[in-house]
């Protein structure tokens, strides 16, 4: 083997005791070149293997080669690869497994029941537990798909709940587990969708004869912004305060956009001033999209 060849070369060098004589021994150059050539062949084969895995599950491109090798070699023991969650999944701190600990005596694979965000430590229950069966690139793709399905389901519920509650209450509403019903990013998305919908409705009202429609809508936007500002003056935990502050940022942007529409006397939704804005929309098929 190449390891044996290198070991013999090193032992010979030690026995010779002279670096010049050791390096000029007959056949040494050819031997080392052969080892280097075979090593390059192994490296190329390994690269092709890893590229094949990355083609199946593209998020492996965000994992270093050493991490990916460790992940693939321990794929049959999912508990050992959870430490790579942050590298594989965007903004995800860890996955919660059932059972939570590795049992060497059990041949059953665990299931993912929840994922925890690394920002704000938000916890989201999977819409359905994901069994970690098969190869890592296969079951991690299933985890990613279920994460997306989970967030889509949460968004649908959030959008439906929005008009049934006061806005601040909707933003901070908690479930039985004392966790917010919506991930903060989903709340921002749902709010942005209603803002876009309301602006379009305002343009329709103006076209129908309500010349003060945008002025009236600005009053609503400012009122919503003031409600959030007042909420920051109350006792809030860090998580809820962060949710409120991020919503204030978006509401301030919405107010500025409406001010610009008023200042430039925009009367139609087809005007460049409005069409150039990034808009959150919910398509008829339930897909959330960003439109410009």
Where do the protein language model's features map onto the residues?
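Charged/polar interaction segments and conserved charged motifs
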Residues: 1-2, 30, 54
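Short interface patches used for recognition in eukaryotic signaling and trafficking proteins
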Residues: 23-27, 53-54, 66-69, 241-243
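Intrinsically disordered, low-complexity terminal segments enriched in Ser/Thr
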Residues: 1-9
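Extended, charged/polar low-complexity intrinsically disordered regions
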Residues: 82, 89-292
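Extended non-catalytic scaffold regions that mediate assembly and binding
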Residues: 10-24, 59, 127
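Extended helix-rich, non-globular scaffold segments
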Residues: 10, 29-33, 78
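Subunit-assembly interface segments of extracellular/virion macromolecular structures
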Residues: 25-28, 32-36, 42, 60
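Amphipathic alpha-helical packing elements
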Residues: 14, 18, 39-95
């Amino acid at each position: 083997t190449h390891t044996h060849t290198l070991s013999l070369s090193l032992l010979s060098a030690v026995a010779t005791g002279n670096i010049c004589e050791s390096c000029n021994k007959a056949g040494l150059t050819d031997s080392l070149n052969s080892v280097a050539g075979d090593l390059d062949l192994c490296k190329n084969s390994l690269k092709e293997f890893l590229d094949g895995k990355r083609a199946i599950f593209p998020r492996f491109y965000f994992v270093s080669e050493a991490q990916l090798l460790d992940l693939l070699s321990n794929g049959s023991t999912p508990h050992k690869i959870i430490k790579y969650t942050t590298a594989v999944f965007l903004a995800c701190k860890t996955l919660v497994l059932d059972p939570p600990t590795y049992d060497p005596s059990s041949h059953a694979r665990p299931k993912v029941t929840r994922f925890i965000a690394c920002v704000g430590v938000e916890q989201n229950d999977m819409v359905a537990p994901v069994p970690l069966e098969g190869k890592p690139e296969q079951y991690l793709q299933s985890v990613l798909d279920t994460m997306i399905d989970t967030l889509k389901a949460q968004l649908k519920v959030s959008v439906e709940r929005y008009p049934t509650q006061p806005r601040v209450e909707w933003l901070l509403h908690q479930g039985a587990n004392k966790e917010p019903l919506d991930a903060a990013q989903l709340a921002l998305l749902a709010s942005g969708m209603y803002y876009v919908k309301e602006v379009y409705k305002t343009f329709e009202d103006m076209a129908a004869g309500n010349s003060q429609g945008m002025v009236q809508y600005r009053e609503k936007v400012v009122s919503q912004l003031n409600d959030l500002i007042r909420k920051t003056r109350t006792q809030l935990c860090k998580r809820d305060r962060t949710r409120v502050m991020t919503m204030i940022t978006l509401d301030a942007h919405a107010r500025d956009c409406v001010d610009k529409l008023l200042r430039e006397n925009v009367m139609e939704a087809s005007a460049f001033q409005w069409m150039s804005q990034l808009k959150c929309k919910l398509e008829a098929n339930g897909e959330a999209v960003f439109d410009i």
